[in-house]
Amino acid sequence: MTTLIYDSTFEGLLTAVFEVFEYKYDAVEIIAKENYTQENFFAETHEVITDFEKSDRVLKKLEENLGKEGISQLMLVYFSERKDLERLILSAVRHSINHPKQNILKDFGNDDMLEISKICRSV
């Protein structure tokens, strides 16, 4: 398990998502710096430095796959301040990359997409 620690900004989160793909991390957890506590001494940690070029690339790919409405929904998840917001956003990006022609945020058969939908309706 690799833990990516980012600076709590949306751009930092998108940079972390980029680095998941860049370094081909499979078992990964993304955590904001202020929420990080080292629970697993054997886990590898990687501190993410916010890179606006990387975050812009992720944003452009998301806009291509999900449109502006999809990005707005992911922003709502980010602003929800849930403990699992990073996992949900990473799951949405992975799902979007794997199914680029599909509106993955309407894929309610996927538990994470259903949870994102619930968050967006509650706001």
Regions found by a protein language model. Give the residues of each.
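N-terminal ordered "arm"
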Residues: 1-51
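Charged, alpha-helical interface segments at or near domain boundaries
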Residues: 40, 45-123
